[in-house]
Amino acid sequence: VQAGTKSKRNILDILKSTIEFKGTYPYPVHRIDKETTGVLIVAKNRKYAQLFTSLFRIRKIHKTYLCIALGKLNKDKGTFIDELFHYEGDRKIKTKAITHFKVLDTNNNYSLLKLNPQTGRKHQLRKQLLIHGCPVLGDNKYKIINRKTNKKNLLMLHAYKINFSIADSKYSFSAEIPFSFKNILKEKYLKIS
């Protein structure tokens, strides 16, 4: 959502200039890493921003990610439960991170994974995959040194789908898999079944 250290524009600036947000202010409801592609919920007013924030807090919004990872996991499906660390000033803070995973395909030393985070920690999926020996392909921050990457060094993590319910109505939004992601799938002989 925010601009990176080398970029002056962010998604909010871009949205403000669109017809959909004319006369309103976009309220980001959650974060997505700047290199990650896919679905992002942005509310058009404070009321809905607060509603979606509360749905996230009580874990009523479910996100699905697709990821191309380096390596293979020990199981075809399961749950990662890890303690992640970050710093607030000089204090080291420990937080619990939970992610459900399913291996969709593997070939050589690459895996196509479906990831469903139960918690929403900063860089959670990237950190957990590194902990479990399968870093995200193209991740320059959370990587195993001297491991292969892709030619364009793009992060192969895609926020594929978001599901939630409001007042007994179910909603599901998905983002098409980017061309760059499809190319790497083809290059690594991985298939989404």
What residue spans do the PLM features occupy?
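RNA pseudouridine synthases
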Residues: 1-193
